[in-house]
Amino acid sequence: MRWMLILFLTLAFTVLGCTPTDQPVSREDVLNNPDKYASQEVEIEVKPGEWLTDWDQAIAVAKKQKLPILVDFTGSDWCIWCKKLDSEVFSKEEFINYAKKNLVLLKLDFPHGIPQSDAMKAANKKKMNKFNIEGFPTIVLVNAEGKEIARTGYRPGGAESYINHLQDLLTKQNDIK
């Protein structure tokens, strides 16, 4: 009887352990366990309005959602104008609600005191060079293929004014097509 119970439990755990799930994997799980997912193509769950930090992931989301990407080149822990842009615009409910429906958000950070992996530093530096970023904050709007649409930076006036500015930049690009 005991052997049958052990055999049953072993089979049950084997079958349940091998059952695939259709649940998306959280971004944090992939970032915290890169070896676990290194050989797999994983669909990462991204919440609308959430800031991404990986270029390739942002491109994939933009293609899937058919949205432009707002790339924030920032020095989040030392750049005064970056901090102002974050506190006056990016952290406001108006902007967050707008971004959820209209943008993929990508933050490429160049901090002085916040630890980053060497891979992230190199990837961010590569994009900084590609887009000829000379100062912070620089906001670059790109399409789902990564081609620059427009660029801007800090602007006074708060979230509503900034949203209008972004819409103008995106509308001008659509008018050119």
What is the role of each PLM region?
Residues 49-52, 88, 92-122:
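Thiol-based oxidoreductase modules, predominantly thioredoxin-like and allied folds used
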Residues 15-17:
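C-terminal motif of bacterial Sec signal peptides marking the signal peptidase cleavage site
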Residues 1-5:
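Positively charged n-region of N-terminal signal peptides that target proteins for export
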Residues 88, 129-175:
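Non-catalytic, surface beta->alpha helical segment in thiol-disulfide oxidoreductase systems
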